[in-house]
């Protein structure tokens, strides 16, 4: 049987890919296409020695994109495969599975129909995910494909955690409730931290903090998600690069009224113009904001304080939801790489039993590590996420 799995993540104008050899989970090839349907589209790939190569190519739509990825994967010089027959299956990141999907599934016509019914909930992402699936079907009709849903891990939340206190018919008519995102990441790191520490997930209360350009926190009890900070859409919860996170609904209607904004314009303000970028007016990139704060920019300092405070509040809330916490872990671009932000997140959590080893924390960048002191009641860890490997493993298990 064929142990090579291709993982695809199709966005509205991009396709990321990673090719795994599942005999040892090694990455054989990786890269991505950007600016699909726009001028200047290109494929960026990482060669086996770690160097990056950019190939410009006109990619008008997703099928052409997938075709070009297949072409590069089997290229005599650049490719990792002799032929596409070496591929065992393709795994897809699917963003919004609604209430229909609580685990990964083999993509059949029936499944795709059910997934299409969730388009309303993720109008940007889901149609792009479908384009990727259809492109693969068109080019390799017989290859098995698997869908791994960003929302699936959170489907174990109890109703009192996922319902909003809106008129109940809003839930009945439109499925308005908390769904949560980054589920594949939260699932991976919550499992991985238990392996890393050599503990059984049963009886463990874990708070997983996926902090990057988008950010979400989950409460994981006995290996199952019981709450998460993102909601119906990825807009709720933490302050993010360009997203507001939690904001008073009354402020939303007030701004729409004062500025004369249509719903789509208001959505754009909340999703693309808010967060760190909105508060600082400088950048959505934490590295730039941290640098500017060190140089004395007051709005960058404010944004960092707000950002860390929001993370800390959610950690406190989820400790309350689980009657305590055993493990807090950080992952994502900021969580894995920004030691000073991790310190800010943990600052003042002594009451919870968190004691950070500051010297150790300062040495950790993108590695698995324990960053709490040996006598800390709560174990604090950094666990780099690997959503693609999780997708590849799920795909292997289903084909």
PLM ranges: what are they?
Residues 268, 275-279, 286-321:
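Adenine-nucleotide phosphate-binding core of ATP-dependent small-molecule kinases
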Residues 1-98:
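N-terminal glycine/serine-rich phosphate-binding loop of ATP-dependent small-molecule kinases
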Residues 11, 92-95, 211-213, 325, ...:
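Glycine-rich beta-strand-to-loop/alpha-helix junction loops that act as flexible
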Residues 221, 227-259, 268, 332-363:
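Catalytic phosphate/nucleotide-handling subdomain of diverse soluble enzymes
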Residues 153-258:
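Glycine-rich phosphate-binding loop of actin/hexokinase-like ATP-binding domains
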Residues 73, 77-125, 146, 152-161:
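Short beta-strand-loop/turn "lid" adjacent to the catalytic site in phosphate-handling enzymes
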Residues 72-87, 193-200, 315-326:
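Phosphate/pyrophosphate-binding loops at sites that engage ATP/ADP/AMP, CoA/4′-phosphopantetheine
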Residues 301, 305-326, 335-399:
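Internal helix-turn-beta structural module
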